[in-house]
């Protein structure tokens, strides 16, 4: 069972919130002493919103100018209340007429229906005194005030914690964590309360065991029972297969709670794929590392924009079951794999924008990580860091071609490249980017780290382009780690599309590359752009040189690395890669048990 740390502070209030939440979500037979009027009022917006339910059952949402006198807002509320009474009376009369026309029993009363002919009295009270009608809305609607409409009183709640977004994944599998996408205003997910229920087929549940009432679309509503999980994340078990899930949640901010909400999964829990390639790796990463260690992950997760092409299905990955290439399926595997590493830093490549915001952020945030994103064209880079260990100080992302053209740091390199216009054109056409995040330790402010993440040009004959891109990257990293933050350690992750035998890898590890290296003519003599390059870092591949980090039907090789600065960091342990038997169980990658054509690199680093 997946559980979140740091929840003990909420235990004391959870039972109170749950009792209130159940009352709110229960049947309408229980009448509350005072209704709720929710006011949203923020200084940056000209209007405030007011939300409440009238006695006729209708729900009113009003937008009023903050600078408007209270009297006008109260007058509008009175008008709405009068309309509500009129609708109730009209509905009663319509039902009576239908009864007469269908031969139904006559009503005992023969007189006309009573209809409200005047607006109800509407007042706003604060500390038991009526608020003057010339007071502006922004000042009148205070938290704890009481709105009275006729005989009905409403407690005013100004800016309570509120869910602005609440969504469950479309595809849910047994054994894989379910992470709802949350948006909370005036609150935070960590201070909110969650309770999970699972469906029981009609006739299979005892009435006393059911949870909140269902609003199922089926002819017979489902019954619900508690799962016993009261955390943000729920991992369904095999017994849940075929059942839908329900989440009951109450937003909070550590001081108070807002209106509860419920949502149900659209589809029932599906069976999982069984053992995945990363399950054995998780045995090495059961716990978050201590403060002196930095568990780092680098992973090309295979962008959906590439996985869903006809070329991918028929040429690149014809051995992969089509459903296993679907994003909804792969997201379950990616989320489980990443959260199971308990990493402090995660650098991802080939991240679709929607995957970042709708899948990765909700999942990793629930496990204590925060992320930043850099778009390339159709996909981009994402870096996540553990909030309990690091805070983000600054970002220094660049596009290689833009930096090469406009940044004075690369003026000399551009002049050399311009000696071969054809090569220069090819380099400047590439859209590759570099993501740099400077992080500061939350426990020792003197400890900072430069985390770089990139995905270099992919073409097999693009060796010289990757050399130029790496030179731009290292110069920019030097500027950040030596000029802006002198002496901070460097971790450089990515898919470098270069095996250990290439010029790019030799350049990084040895610190220089000669102008006569064969990679300068990787696409023929007409594009040769020979030049000597060197850099000041002492870098090492933290995970060594595995036989492969990319394994597809027509190719396998080591393309991914976590480069570290040997002067400031050392490797504590490398998490073993999946065995060759695991990788080839379904011929190659991706597969039903592995979500990408790449394999994640995972290692524990240590400050020197």
UniProtKB/Swiss-Prot annotation:
<dbReference type="GO" id="GO:0005759">
    <property type="term" value="C:mitochondrial matrix"/>
</dbReference>
<dbReference type="InterPro" id="IPR036691">
    <property type="entry name" value="Endo/exonu/phosph_ase_sf"/>
</dbReference>
<dbReference type="Pfam" id="PF03372">
    <property type="entry name" value="Exo_endo_phos"/>
</dbReference>
<dbReference type="GO" id="GO:0045070">
    <property type="term" value="P:positive regulation of viral genome replication"/>
</dbReference>
<keyword id="KW-0597">Phosphoprotein</keyword>
<dbReference type="GO" id="GO:0035457">
    <property type="term" value="P:cellular response to interferon-alpha"/>
</dbReference>
<dbReference type="GO" id="GO:0046872">
    <property type="term" value="F:metal ion binding"/>
</dbReference>
<dbReference type="GO" id="GO:0000288">
    <property type="term" value="P:nuclear-transcribed mRNA catabolic process, deadenylation-dependent decay"/>
</dbReference>
<dbReference type="GO" id="GO:0005739">
    <property type="term" value="C:mitochondrion"/>
</dbReference>
<dbReference type="GO" id="GO:0071346">
    <property type="term" value="P:cellular response to type II interferon"/>
</dbReference>
<dbReference type="InterPro" id="IPR048821">
    <property type="entry name" value="PDE12-like_N"/>
</dbReference>
<dbReference type="GO" id="GO:0006397">
    <property type="term" value="P:mRNA processing"/>
</dbReference>
<keyword id="KW-0809">Transit peptide</keyword>
<keyword id="KW-0378">Hydrolase</keyword>
<keyword id="KW-0269">Exonuclease</keyword>
<keyword id="KW-0507">mRNA processing</keyword>
<comment type="similarity">
    <text>Belongs to the CCR4/nocturin family.</text>
</comment>
<protein>
    <recommendedName>
        <fullName>2',5'-phosphodiesterase 12</fullName>
        <ecNumber>3.1.4.-</ecNumber>
        <ecNumber>3.1.13.4</ecNumber>
    </recommendedName>
</protein>
<dbReference type="GO" id="GO:0000958">
    <property type="term" value="P:mitochondrial mRNA catabolic process"/>
</dbReference>
<dbReference type="GO" id="GO:0044528">
    <property type="term" value="P:regulation of mitochondrial mRNA stability"/>
</dbReference>
<feature type="binding site">
    <location>
        <position position="350"/>
    </location>
    <ligand>
        <name>Mg(2+) 1</name>
    </ligand>
</feature>
<feature type="binding site">
    <location>
        <position position="497"/>
    </location>
    <ligand>
        <name>Mg(2+) 2</name>
    </ligand>
</feature>
<feature type="transit peptide" description="Mitochondrion">
    <location>
        <begin position="1"/>
        <end position="16"/>
    </location>
</feature>
<dbReference type="GO" id="GO:0140374">
    <property type="term" value="P:antiviral innate immune response"/>
</dbReference>
<keyword id="KW-0496">Mitochondrion</keyword>
<feature type="region of interest" description="Disordered">
    <location>
        <begin position="90"/>
        <end position="111"/>
    </location>
</feature>
<keyword id="KW-0460">Magnesium</keyword>
<keyword id="KW-0479">Metal-binding</keyword>
<dbReference type="InterPro" id="IPR005135">
    <property type="entry name" value="Endo/exonuclease/phosphatase"/>
</dbReference>
<comment type="function">
    <text>Enzyme that cleaves 2',5'-phosphodiester bond linking adenosines of the 5'-triphosphorylated oligoadenylates, triphosphorylated oligoadenylates referred as 2-5A modulates the 2-5A system. Degrades triphosphorylated 2-5A to produce AMP and ATP. Also cleaves 3',5'-phosphodiester bond of oligoadenylates. Plays a role as a negative regulator of the 2-5A system that is one of the major pathways for antiviral and antitumor functions induced by interferons (IFNs). Suppression of this enzyme increases cellular 2-5A levels and decreases viral replication in cultured small-airway epithelial cells.</text>
</comment>
<keyword id="KW-0540">Nuclease</keyword>
<feature type="compositionally biased region" description="Basic residues">
    <location>
        <begin position="90"/>
        <end position="99"/>
    </location>
</feature>
<dbReference type="Pfam" id="PF21171">
    <property type="entry name" value="PDE12-like_N"/>
</dbReference>
<feature type="active site" description="Proton donor/acceptor">
    <location>
        <position position="495"/>
    </location>
</feature>
<feature type="modified residue" description="Phosphoserine">
    <location>
        <position position="216"/>
    </location>
</feature>
<feature type="binding site">
    <location>
        <position position="495"/>
    </location>
    <ligand>
        <name>Mg(2+) 2</name>
    </ligand>
</feature>
<dbReference type="InterPro" id="IPR050410">
    <property type="entry name" value="CCR4/nocturin_mRNA_transcr"/>
</dbReference>
<dbReference type="GO" id="GO:0004535">
    <property type="term" value="F:poly(A)-specific ribonuclease activity"/>
</dbReference>
<dbReference type="GO" id="GO:0071359">
    <property type="term" value="P:cellular response to dsRNA"/>
</dbReference>
């Amino acid at each position: 069972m997946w559980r979140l740390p740091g929840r003990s502070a909420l235990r004391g209030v959870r039972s109170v919130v749950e009792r209130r939440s159940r009352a709110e979500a229960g049947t309408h037979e229980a009448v509350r002493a005072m209704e709720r009027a929710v006011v949203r009022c923020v200084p940056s917006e000209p209007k405030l919103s007011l939300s409440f339910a009238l006695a006729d059952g209708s729900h009113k949402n009003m937008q009023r100018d903050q600078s408007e006198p209270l009297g006008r807002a109260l007058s509008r509320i009175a008008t709405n209340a009068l309309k509500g009474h009129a609708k109730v009376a009209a509905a009663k009369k319509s039902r009576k007429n239908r009864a007469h026309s269908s031969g139904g029993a006559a009503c005992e009363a023969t007189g006309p229906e009573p209809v409200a002919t005047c607006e109800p009295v509407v007042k706003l009270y604060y500390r038991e005194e009526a608020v003057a009608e010339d007071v502006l809305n922004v000042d009148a609607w205070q938290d704890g005030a009481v709105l009275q409409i006729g005989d009905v009183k409403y407690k005013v709640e100004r800016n309570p914690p509120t869910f602005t977004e609440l969504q469950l994944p479309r595809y849910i599998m047994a054994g894989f964590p379910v992470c709802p996408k949350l948006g909370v205003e005036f609150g935070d997910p960590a201070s909110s309360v969650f309770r999970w229920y699972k469906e029981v087929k009609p006739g299979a549940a005892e009435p006393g065991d059911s949870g909140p009432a269902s609003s199922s679309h089926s002819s017979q509503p489902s019954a619900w029972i508690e799962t016993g999980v009261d955390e943000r994340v729920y991992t369904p078990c095999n017994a849940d297969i075929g059942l839908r899930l329900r989440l009951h949640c109450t937003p909070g901010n550590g001081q108070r709670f807002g209106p509860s909400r419920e949502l149900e999964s659209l589809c029932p829990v599906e069976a999982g794929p069984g053992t995945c390639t990363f399950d054995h790796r998780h045995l090495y990463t059961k716990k978050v590392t201590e403060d002196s260690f930095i568990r780092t992950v680098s992973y090309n997760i295979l962008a959906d924009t590439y996985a869903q092409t006809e070329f991918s299905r028929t040429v690149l990955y014809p051995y992969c079951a089509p459903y296993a290439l679907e994003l909804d399926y792969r997201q379950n595997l990616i989320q489980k794999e990443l959260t199971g590493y308990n990493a402090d830093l995660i650098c991802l490549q080939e991240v679709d924008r929607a995957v970042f915001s709708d899948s990765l952020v909700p999942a990793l945030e629930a496990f204590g990580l925060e992320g930043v994103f850099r778009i390339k064209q159709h996909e981009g880079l994402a870096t996540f860091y553990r909030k309990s260990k690091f805070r983000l100080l600054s970002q220094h992302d660049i596009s290689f071609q833009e930096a090469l053209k406009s940044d004075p740091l690369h003026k000399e390199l551009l002049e050399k490249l311009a000696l071969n216009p054809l090569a220069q054109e090819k380099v400047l056409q590439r859209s590759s980017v570099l993501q740099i995040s400077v992080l500061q330790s939350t426990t020792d402010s003197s400890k900072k780290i430069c985390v770089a993440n990139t995905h270099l040009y992919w073409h097999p004959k693009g060796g010289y382009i990757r050399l130029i891109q790496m030179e731009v990257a290292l110069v920019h990293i030097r500027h950040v780690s030596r000029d802006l933050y002198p002496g901070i350690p460097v971790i450089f992750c990515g898919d470098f599309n270069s095996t250990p035998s290439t010029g790019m890898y030799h350049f990084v590890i040895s610190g220089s590359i000669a102008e006569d290296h064969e990679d300068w003519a990787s696409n023929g003599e007409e594009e040769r752009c020979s030049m000597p390059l060197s850099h000041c870092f002492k870098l090492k591949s933290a995970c060594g040189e595995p036989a492969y980090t990319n394994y597809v039907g027509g190719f396998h090789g080591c393309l991914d690395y976590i480069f570290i600065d040997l002067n400031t960091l050392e490797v504590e342990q490398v998490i073993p890669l999946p065995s060759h038997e695991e990788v080839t169980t379904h011929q190659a990658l991706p597969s039903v048990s592995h979500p990408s054509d790449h394999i994640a690199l995972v290692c524990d680093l240590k400050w020197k």
